[in-house]
């Protein structure tokens, strides 16, 4: 009985060794490439965000309060050199700002999820605010969130380039 038990254990160890030794080096699992449809959807979302950035800036430039507000989420915040502002404060700033010209450069849209995107860019302006020249180059970022089928700005930050 002892011999049979020893033989059984030896056979089990040998079979296990052979089984594990036959496994080759695992090959890396290929990373699936994005489907053309998914890439197209991403490109469409990115183009939509770029259009929204331009539209909200035009509404600001033309002091179109209602048009400007329709792009802002109810919980919108803006951050600039003066501090953190809500939508009402941003609209008040719009009324005190004369934006005569602007141009975007290096715009990049990053999709964080199907409903959240971040636009980063450089903008050069010719502008005054409360009578002071504020012209220059700025770095800006906007976080967009899709709510009830509509993209809304939830956060915008704007800092003058040094």
Labelled PLM ranges:
Residues 8-17:
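Bacterial N-terminal signal peptides
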Residues 137-162:
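Short beta-strand edge/turn micro-motifs at domain boundaries
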């Amino acid at each position: 009985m002892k011999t049979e038990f020893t033989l059984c254990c030896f056979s089990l160890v040998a079979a296990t060794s052979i089984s594990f030794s036959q496994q080759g080096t695992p090959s890396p699992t290929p990373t699936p490439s994005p489907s053309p449809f998914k890439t197209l959807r991403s490109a469409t979302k990115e183009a939509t965000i770029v259009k929204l950035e331009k539209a909200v800036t035009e509404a600001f430039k033309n002091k179109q309060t209602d048009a400007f507000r329709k792009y802002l989420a109810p919980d919108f915040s803006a951050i600039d050199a003066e501090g953190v502002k809500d939508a009402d404060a941003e609209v008040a700033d719009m009324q005190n700002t004369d934006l005569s010209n602007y141009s975007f450069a290096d715009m990049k849209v990053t999709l964080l999820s199907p409903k959240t995107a971040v636009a980063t860019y450089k903008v050069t302006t010719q502008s005054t605010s409360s009578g002071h020249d504020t012209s220059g180059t700025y770095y800006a970022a906007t976080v967009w969130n899709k709510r009830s089928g509509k993209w809304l700005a939830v956060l915008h930050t704007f800092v003058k380039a040094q």
